[in-house]
Amino acid sequence: MPGPVTWLPDAEGTVTDLPVFGSASPMREVTETVAFDAAWDSSRRAKVRELFDGMAADWSSRATPEREASILDALDRGGLAGGTVIELGSGTGLGTGHLIERFDDLIALDLSMQMLRHQPDLAPKVQADASMLPFPDGAADLLVLVNMLLFPAEVDRVVRPGGGLLWINTLGHETPIHLSPEAVVDALPGSWTATAGRAGSGLWAAVQRV
């Protein structure tokens, strides 16, 4: 059953006039169909892996203070506890560098081996498909997804009772891989509630199992 989303006031310096970018990306349709229709198969997996393998070498050059602001704000105001934290879609480590400063028990996971090869050795790395996580039921206190596809059934399986999900889109509604906080809560099985906010050029949702 979907729970409520409580929006916090925008952080100081939030960018509200975002250029049209991600809403026209083919990844937007992939994001929505994967979250709501479970439309993920070996062909789509291979195409997404190839896409991100090809972008890995210069992926870190996309980092800007405005994009990172949403990650920092989510960690500051999201209110989710740590414990065992797994970052899904860790890429080359844009979020990982901030997460390792907050959480002692962190695993960085990505579908793209090339992304992981370009990521600094900040945390243990796992190359895997987030639709079939190599972790037992209830293994995580917190999952962190920065510009990452949402696989609701696996989130529901891996997050412990009382655990949570931190969902971050660093370009807000213009992030190619974007779902609104309301859509994230709606997609998840079971009962969840969320706190959401905007900072820099991005938005985030701290989603708690209830």
Give residue spans per PLM region.
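Class I SAM-dependent methyltransferase SAM/SAH-binding core
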Residues: G91-M132
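Conserved class I S-adenosyl-L-methionine
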Residues: P4-L80, G82-G91, L166-A187
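A short acidic, Gly/Pro-enriched loop at the edge of an enzyme's catalytic core
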Residues: S131-L143
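Core SAM-dependent methyltransferase catalytic element
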Residues: A196-V210
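A short glycine-rich, Lys/Arg-flanked "PGG" loop and its adjoining helix->strand segment in the class I
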Residues: P152-G164
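A short SAM/SAH-binding and catalytic strip from SAM-dependent methyltransferases
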Residues: D141-A153
